[in-house]
Structures are given as C-alpha cells and as structure tokens.
C-alpha cells in the first residue's frame, strides 16, 4: 500500500479544473467527453464506465480504482496502463496527486 499523504479536496478541485476537466466530468449522470465521466469511480474496475469506448489496455488491466491505484496511475498513466488513450502526462507532485484524489473521492460518489 502506497504512503499517500492526506489531500485537500478544495485544492484538488483546482487541480481537476486545470488539468482534468477538459476531458472528464465528475457528476452523476455527467456526459463523457474525450475521457469518461468519473462518477462512481472508486470501487469500479478499469474500462467499465457505461457507454464509454475504452482501449483494450484499459478494459484488460483489471484493477479496481481506489486511492492506491489512482496514486500510481495519476503519476504516469501511460506507464501504469500501456496503451491507454489518456494523453495526460501525469502529476509528479505528490501533494497535487493527493489533493486530486481527495477531490475525486468526494466528487464522484
């Protein structure tokens, strides 16, 4: 289990708006954009948001999204899921990743 620092959801919302919102929505019933809607993300397996067209790499990764998996994925998405179509380079700063995860945990329920 990764040593994940406590995040600040308010700061994480700013990270989401700046780095993620161009391709993702978080609200229940939100539409897919270039990337899938993230509502219900925690506890869902990779490649499983209904109605979104995923790569085989995402569908076949077979992990369940949670703090630990998001921590590793958000640092370097293409390393964690080679073949993903997510073009985001990742968040190298631990505090930004922790804040974003705190925001996602709160906003995608």
UniProtKB/Swiss-Prot annotation:
User: Which InterPro entries does the entry mention?
Assistant: Cyt_c-like_dom, Cyt_c-like_dom_sf, Cyt_c_1A/1B
- Protein name according to UniProt: Cytochrome c
Q: What does this protein do?
A: Electron carrier protein. The oxidized form of the cytochrome c heme group can accept an electron from the heme group of the cytochrome c1 subunit of cytochrome reductase. Cytochrome c then transfers this electron to the cytochrome oxidase complex, the final protein carrier in the mitochondrial electron-transport chain.
- Gene3D superfamilies with a match to the protein in the record: Cytochrome c-like domain (1.10.760.10)
One example of the protein's molecular function in GO is: heme binding
Keywords of the record: Electron transport, Heme, Iron, Metal-binding, Mitochondrion, Respiratory chain, Transport
> One Pfam family this chain carries?
Cytochrom_C
